Amino acid sequence: MTAPTIPGAEPFSHIGSSDAGVLVLHGFTGNPGSMRGLAEACAAAGFHVELPQLAGHGTAMEDMIPTRWADWSGDADKAYQVLAKRASKIVVMGLSMGGALTLWMAAEHPEAKGIVCINPATQPQPVEVLN
């Protein structure tokens, strides 16, 4: 069962005036409200914008418990597809888990024109792997 969305945690969508779009992704235990200011700034600059409410977020903690990466990445990809219908150039940006999703989206969608990762939640790698 899904609880009602907390006021201010609603997804955000904007039809812009350019051929560029921005997909904005919030972090784990967060909701679209935490990234709304950034999304609205992109919209004010004329970009198409999608800021989805990731599965299990923005409602009640009980809704988050059964959700997994596949749910969140699926939500991100659906939002990307919606944005791609309006924008030929897409930049993906995200905070924390949204930053990790942004990295995943870049691998899944190499046609994306850019990424912005804000404190991405990633697994640290040993120095040998990085060399």
What are these regions (language model features)?
Residues G94-G98, T102:
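Gly/Ala-rich beta-loop-alpha elbow adjacent to hydrolase catalytic centers
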Residues W104-E108:
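Active-site signature of alpha/beta-hydrolase-fold catalytic machinery across serine-
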Residues F47, S88, P110:
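Short phosphate-binding/catalytic loops that engage adenosine nucleotides
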Residues T67-A70, P110, N131:
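Short, hinge-like loop/turn segments at secondary-structure boundaries
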Residues V116-V127:
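Active-site nucleophile loop of the alpha/beta-hydrolase fold
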Residues A3-A60:
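Short, surface-exposed "cap/lid" segments of acyl-processing enzymes
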Residues A60-V91:
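Catalytic nucleophile-loop/oxyanion-hole region of alpha/beta-hydrolase
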